[in-house]
Swiss-Prot record:
Chain's role: Required for the formation of a threonylcarbamoyl group on adenosine at position 37 (t(6)A37) in tRNAs that read codons beginning with adenine. Is involved in the transfer of the threonylcarbamoyl moiety of threonylcarbamoyl-AMP (TC-AMP) to the N6 group of A37, together with TsaE and TsaB. TsaD likely plays a direct catalytic role in this reaction.
Name under which the protein is recorded: tRNA N6-adenosine threonylcarbamoyltransferase
Binding-site list for Fe cation: 109, 113, 312
UniProt cofactor note: Binds 1 Fe(2+) ion per subunit.
Organism of derivation: Chlorobium luteolum (strain DSM 273 / BCRC 81028 / 2530) (Pelodictyon luteolum)
Binding locations of substrate: 136-140, 169, 182, 186, 284
């Protein structure tokens, strides 16, 4: 089966081709036009997707050495995401599927991230997956879910306010780091001391207001952002400049510490022997190191996607479509699919 996947949920335009479960191409174009604004501008993102969707699709097909006539299925992100951006890819994919007379599959962007650690592991052909704990962390989402072998899942924890990726970006911006600040914190923190200052870790065993959070797998990062801002305002500029790497390492340690404690705690509480970490924040080097150490300590298998598949990409869209189709879990044709902006709007 040859699947063309398309992804336009935020600021990456991506096209990928999956042939019998193998990724033959995964073309990604990251939009640089937002850098001067310090964040993604939705209208600019939509216009860039409109400009790029055709050449990206053509590049994905060319790299995979196939033509439009070879395509069996077309899959695209239907959300969550920036609604205008989602509509560009969704309407293009539906129109292309209709014109070619092939089935169209709508894919939930966050669900696709959940299964991205298993790309290239021969799972799209129907091999076993699950059960595992999924920790999905990005700029817009932070959630924990129990994923079963039949690909269904139950969300057991989610952020009550801000996502981990947003916490990285906003605190990095407070430090004067360039956009996107998350990767900049990761690089700078390598030169710093994570024990320099202890920032709060809400809803964890280390929280000052902790009662019993053993069975609470929700997240909260708004307090961390406020704490960092308040602390920085109390310091002299010279001090901040001198210790910027230490501050970055301390912020990163607080965010990563929460993510690791929650994910490992969920696996142990529910007696599940595997954790899959996904989403843009899964590219963070300290999260990978700390999660690996914690999983080794407790005998838990760890799955993290390669850097290529950590950020938004169309290979994960095509892979999840292939997984579901191989199990007969999703209708082949849904031309009436409407885009949705939030994860809850998808009925999850």
């Amino acid at each position: 089966m040859i699947i063309l996947g398309l992804e336009t949920s935020c600021d990456e335009t991506s096209g990928a081709v999956l042939v019998d479960g193998e990724v033959r191409s995964n073309v990604v174009s990251s939009q640089l036009c937002h850098k001067g604004f310090g964040g993604v501008v939705p209208e600019l993102a939509s216009r860039e997707h409109e400009r790029l969707i055709v050449p990206i699709t053509e590049a994905a097909l060319a790299e995979a050495n196939i033509t439009k006539k070879d395509i069996d299925v077309i899959a695209a992100t239907a959300g969550p995401g920036l609604i205008g951006a989602v509509m560009v890819g969704l309407s293009f994919a539906q129109s292309m599927a209709w014109a070619l007379g092939v089935p169209f599959v709508a894919v939930n962007h966050v669900e696709a991230h959940m299964f991205s650690p298993f790309i290239d592991q021969e799972t799209a052909g129907g091999g076993p997956i699950g059960p595992f704990i999924s920790l999905t962390v990005s700029g817009g989402h932070t959630l924990l879910a129990i994923v079963r072998e039949d690909l269904t899942y139950r969300i057991i924890g989610r952020t009550l306010d801000d996502a981990a990726g947003e916490a990285f970006d906003k605190t990095g911006k407070m430090l004067g780091l360039p956009y996107p600040a998350g990767p900049a914190i990761d690089r700078l923190a390598k030169e710093g001391d994570a024990g320099f200052h202890r920032f709060p870790r809400a809803l964890t065993s280390q929280s000052q207001t902790s009662r019993s959070y053993r069975d609470n797998f929700d997240f909260s990062f708004s307090g961390l952002k406020t704490s960092v801002l308040t602390w920085l305002r109390s310091q002299k500029e010279e001090f901040i400049h001198e210790h910027r790497a230490d501050i970055a390492a301390s912020i990163q340690d607080a965010i990563v510490g929460v993510l690791v404690e929650k994910a490992v705690g969920a696996a142990r509480r529910h007696n599940i022997g595997a954790i899959a970490v996904a989403g843009g924040v899964s590219a963070n080097s300290e999260l990978r190191r700390a999660m690996d150490a914690a999983c080794r300590k407790h005998g838990i298998a760890l799955f993290i996607p390669s850097a290529t598949y950590s950020t938004d990409n169309a290979a994960m869209i095509a892979t999840l479509a292939g997984l579901k189709l191989s199990r007969g879990l999703q209708p082949l044709c849904r031309y009436d699919t409407a885009p949705f902006a939030s994860f809850s709007a998808a009925g999850n």
